[in-house]
Amino acid sequence: MASSDKQTSPKPPPSPSPLRNSKFCQSNMRILISGGAGFIGSHLVDKLMENEKNEVIVADNYFTGSKDNLKKWIGHPRFELIRHDVTEPLLIEVDQIYHLACPASPIFYKYNPVKTIKTNVIGTLNMLGLAKRVGARILLTSTSEVYGDPLIHPQPESYWGNVNPIGVRSCYDEGKRVAETLMFDYHRQHGIEIRIARIFNTYGPRMNIDDGRVVSNFIAQALRGEALTVQKPGTQTRSFCYVSDMVDGLMRLMEGDDTGPINIGNPGEFTMVELAETVKELINPSIEIKMVENTPDDPRQRKPDITKAKEVLGWEPKVKLREGLPLMEEDFRLRLGVHKN
């Protein structure tokens, strides 16, 4: 084998910066969450703030996130909120970086596809540059979308995917694939400590009400008394993970020894018609279910193989769909001003 083809072992991780050692040498763990004002990010903040030795810094541009998700922590001495776009460098001192920043809903990433891919590529480069400078460990929330419209079911981490590189979803799908590449290149070339989570469909309180994702769509429609709009043919499947389970998986990955990628998701699989019927039964039995045209490149099936998460992280989801939907319904009722009869 030619020398240029040989596998190169990763360099040892860089030492923390002199500034980190001199100014912040203390027992507290300083943790940055990019996109921390968003749905999953804000729940991650809540969990990390339970540990009194954690100082949590959130950087968010509020494109899809909201200060309301973090209002309980604003003014807390161990919490800091920075209005910042990750496509610009960020100069702070931290020990860990959870890199969540990126629009994850088709409505948002199709609205500004160039911004979406810049966030995935330039934003990830900036977060990796920060990790390199300060010697921080960095976790990327990648996505099940890297598998595209999968030809293998369920999807293990070893599957390379079936992605359309020029479709309307490509800014997100391919952007996350590039972000994963950058993570491993920085790991191999610079010794950065990396973790990659491939997260599957997640639901729960604080989801954007009109973000175009199927669970939030159905619950909002049911509460408004509107027909549930199921994209044809309705037999396409998804797997839904409750947000508390997702946060638990991300934290276990960050604190563990495996770089990933590791699938984090609930392997319970439902067709879109089954999901609509469940939401109808639980929230508003009087509404109709209406079939509408599908969007291009919509995957026919999606289900995580979580064997690796079980073996490496000791993680598997606990909350069943019928347990999680009422918790999300309660949050949506409050925000929509719809009272139970």
UniProtKB/Swiss-Prot annotation:
Where, by residue number, is the active site?
Y172
- Intracellular or extracellular location(s): Cytoplasm
The record ties this protein, via InterPro entries, to: NAD(P)-bd_dom, NAD(P)-bd_dom_sf, UXS-like
Q: Which positions in this protein are listed as binding NAD(+)? A: 60-85, 172-176, 213
Question: Major location, coarse class?
Answer: cytoplasm
Which processes are annotated in GO (biological process)?
D-xylose metabolic process; UDP-D-xylose biosynthetic process; xylan biosynthetic process
Sequence positions that bind substrate: 169, 201, 214-218, 231-238, 298-302
- Under Enzyme Commission nomenclature, its number is 4.1.1.35
- Quickly give the catalysed reaction: UDP-alpha-D-glucuronate + H(+) = UDP-alpha-D-xylose + CO2
Region spans: Disordered: 1-21
Q: Which family does it belong to?
A: Belongs to the NAD(P)-dependent epimerase/dehydratase family. UDP-glucuronic acid decarboxylase subfamily.
Q: What exactly does this protein do?
A: Catalyzes the NAD-dependent decarboxylation of UDP-glucuronic acid to UDP-xylose. Necessary for the biosynthesis of the core tetrasaccharide in glycosaminoglycan biosynthesis.
**Name of protein:** UDP-glucuronic acid decarboxylase 5
Q: State the organism named in the record.
A: Arabidopsis thaliana
